Amino acid sequence: MRQIPFRTGFGYDVHRLSDGYELWLGGIKIPYEQGLEGHSDADVLLHAVCDALLGAAALGDIGVHFPPTDMAFKGIDSKILLERTCQLIREAGYEIGNIDATVAAEAPKLNPHIPEMRRVMAEVMGIPISAISLKATTSERMGFVGHREGMAAYATALIAYASALE
C-alpha cells in the first residue's frame, strides 16, 4: 500500500503553576513569581512539541520515551528531550517540515519572549527559524489557565519521509 510522504501530529500538555519553581517555556527561562511543576523542568511548550512530532511519526508520546517514573529524567532540561525526540524522528526516516504552537497563559506576557523561544527551538531542532511559529494567548480568565492555576500548550508538526524530499 502506498503511503503519502507527509504526516501531521498534534501535541497538548498542561502543568500546574506553583511557588518555588522556575518558569521555563520554549527552552528559555522567563522571569515570573511562579514556575511550572513537573518531573522535568515542566516546559509545557517543548513537551507539546515533542508529542506533536512523536504523534506525526506514530512513535507514541513523550511519556513512552521519557517516562516520569524514570529518575534519569528528574529535573531534566526539556531541550534535551526535544533534541532526543528530533533524533528519533530522523532515525525513523523523517525530516521536520514545521511546527506551529500556542501557549495559553494568563500571565506573564509571553509575546516579548517569542523571538528568543523560536531561536532556541530552531537551534535545538536543527531546522530554520522560519519553520517555527509560536503564539501566546489567554483564556479570558476562564478555567484553570484563566484562574492562573497552570498553563497549557498546543502544537502541530509536519514531517515528511526524507526519501520523498530527494
Where are these regions (language model features)?
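C-terminal edge-of-domain segments
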Residues: 145-164
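RNase III-family endoribonuclease catalytic core
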Residues: 2-115, 120, 125
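Short acidic capping loops at alpha-helix termini that bridge into adjacent secondary structure
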Residues: 128-131
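Pyridoxal 5′-phosphate
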Residues: 134-138
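N-terminal charge/polar-biased segments
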Residues: 1-6, 161-166
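Short active-site-adjacent structural elements
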Residues: 111-112, 141-145
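Glycine-rich, charged/polar anion/phosphate-binding loops
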Residues: 9-11, 140-143
